[in-house]
UniProtKB/Swiss-Prot annotation:
HAMAP family (UniProt xref): GatA
Catalytic residues (UniProt): 74, 149, 173
Catalytic activity: L-glutamyl-tRNA(Gln) + L-glutamine + ATP + H2O = L-glutaminyl-tRNA(Gln) + L-glutamate + ADP + phosphate + H(+)
Family of this protein: Belongs to the amidase family. GatA subfamily.
The UniProt record lists the keyword DNA-binding: no
Name of encoding gene: gatA
Record SUPFAM superfamilies: Amidase signature (AS) enzymes (SSF75304)
GO biological process: translation
Keywords: ATP-binding, Ligase, Nucleotide-binding, Protein biosynthesis
Name the UniProt record assigns to this protein: Glutamyl-tRNA(Gln) amidotransferase subunit A
Organism: Francisella tularensis subsp. novicida (strain U112)
EC number: 6.3.5.7
NCBIfam families: gatA (TIGR00132)
Listed GO MF terms: ATP binding; glutaminyl-tRNA synthase (glutamine-hydrolyzing) activity
Length: 481
């Protein structure tokens, strides 16, 4: 099941041209995004030019699988000649002079960039309410959040503005929005995709990810954007077809680890969806094995010490001098720094910078940052030990369905939205979220996590699951082809 392959067949048969397809999506965005607010920058002229180029390639019979396929990018991936804002006033007018590796790889495959997507500012948030350009609405219920920080990426695909979008995942920022919007999304192993040209939040956690309706499309796209990059020393790359190599194989004999203590406290409807999903996996031949995952509250605390520290260091570059917003009223250098950063950053970003600077202070370093790094290593070892007994670990993707805007303005309650997704980021492991059911008529997602660079097992298992149990009920009518 693949939207990409359906579109490929239509393009290759001449039923529709890349330009016509692009115009359809652009028209839909212009007509409907006023209600959702998922797109920051619409790249109409650039998209039509790329579509014309794609049509020429198709006419010459030299097309690949992705030639002419439209895509939307989270607005923290640099795009040459197109502004990249990270949803911040600080970068409102920043136009990158180069492409990120992720966007370049998409262009090299002949994809058509429709625009840049809304997000939580500098990817800091779980609701997409922390954006200089306004909150994003969930297409399933416009009064609710789409999740974050890649809320625009999830909302756009759920609304049918593109078949595919890119996102980034630092603590669950593709998986939690996928759960809220009824999508499939994956954070690959740390180091499998390049971070070059991706606006940094927390460099040892950040990783590019993909949103789609179907797991097969996620796998196809991850193969397209993954690989070694000379500009990112942490990117080790993966072999060709790493994510798609096992999609046709059945999952009989695969062992799924489940920590029952993580299920018993879930809301009843989500608990029922989880148990039904595990039963479906058993029907496909998988074995369920009881395991004990590390304490999730400790993982949450570890994450919210280390990531603000890394963010404080990364965001120090935005000083009003080199690039970014500059306060026009500053009278001296100190005032320029202070006013530019005070005005240029939103409240949530400033909160995390302050936390980061506090835990990095010499008087607090050993008590907070150093201990958190030690705990990160212990947790990673504990999780990897589980993988000596099982192939994957199953967890919910979120403790709830999408909640209403304004319900979690208290930062601590918002941070708890990431409690099931953070372990994969702490340990650098791959994890995929996929729709498993409904709670209060809203989609909810499950999550599989695997050993580092065993990404192919995750895509295999979810592709086979969706092949047998389908996901059509999770696709909004407006998003259907």
């Amino acid at each position: 099941m693949s939207y990409i392959k359906k579109l490929r067949a239509r393009l290759d048969s001449g039923e529709i041209s890349a330009v016509e397809l692009t115009k359809e999506y652009l028209a839909k965005i212009k007509e409907q995004d006023k209600r959702i607010n998922s797109v920051i920058t619409l790249c109409e002229a650039e998209a039509l030019k790329e579509a014309e180029d794609a049509d020429a390639i198709i006419s010459a019979g030299k097309q690949g699988l992705l030639t002419g396929i439209p895509i939307l990018h989270k607005d923290l991936f640099c795009t040459k000649g197109i502004r990249t804002t990270a949803a911040s006033k600080m970068l409102d007018n920043f136009v990158a002079p180069y492409d990120s590796t992720v966007t370049k790889n998409c262009k090299d495959q002949g994809m058509v960039t429709l625009g840049k997507l809304n997000m939580d500012e500098f990817a800091m948030g779980s609701t997409n309410e922390h954006s200089y350009y306004g909150a994003v609405s969930n297409p399933w219920d416009l009064e609710r959040v789409p999740g974050g920080s890649s809320g625009g990426s999830a909302a756009a695909v759920a609304a049918g503005f593109a078949p595919i979008s890119t996102g980034s995942d630092t603590g669950g920022s593709v998986r939690q929005p996928a759960s809220f919007c009824g999508l499939t999304a994956m954070k690959p192993s740390y180091g499998s995709t390049s971070r070059f040209g991706m606006v940094a939040f927390a460099s040892s956690f950040d990783q590019a990810g993909i949103f789609a309706h179907y797991a097969e499309d996620v796998a196809i796209m991850l193969d397209a954007i993954a690989g070694e990059c000379e500009f990112d020393s942490t990117c080790v790359g993966v072999k060709e077809n790493h994510f798609t190599q096992d999609l046709e194989k059945d999952i009989s004999g695969k062992v799924i680890g489940v920590d029952e203590s993580l299920i018993k406290d879930l809301p009843e409807q989500i608990q029922e969806a989880v148990l039904k999903t595990l039963d479906n996996f058993k029907k496909l031949g998988a074995e369920i094995k009881s395991v004990k995952v590390p304490d999730l509250k400790e993982a949450l605390s570890t994450y919210y010490i280390i990531t603000p520290a890394e963010a404080a260091a990364n965001l120090a570059r935005y000083d009003g001098i080199r690039y970014g917003y500059r306060n026009p009223e500053a009278r001296d250098l100190d005032e320029l720094y202070r006013k530019s950063r005070t005005d240029g950053f939103g409240a949530e970003v400033k909160r995390r910078i302050m936390i980061g600077n506090y835990v990095l202070a010499s008087s607090q370093y050993d008590s907070y940052y150093n201990k958190a790094q030690q705990l990160r290593k212990v947790m990673t070892d504990q999780i990897n030990q589980i993988f000596t007994q099982v192939d994957v670990i199953f967890m919910p993707a979120s403790p709830s369905e999408a909640f209403k805007k304004g319900d979690k303005l208290d930062p601590v309650s918002a941070y708890l939205s990431d409690i099931y997704t953070i372990p994969a980021n702490i340990s650098g492991l791959p994890a995929i979220a996929f729709p498993i059911g409904f709670a209060n008529n809203l989609p909810v997602g499950g999550q599989l996590m695997a050993k580092a660079f065993n990404d192919n097992i995750l895509t295999q298992m979810v592709v086979q699951y969706q092949k047998h149990y389908g996901i059509e009920e999770f696709i909004l009518e407006q998003a259907r082809i």
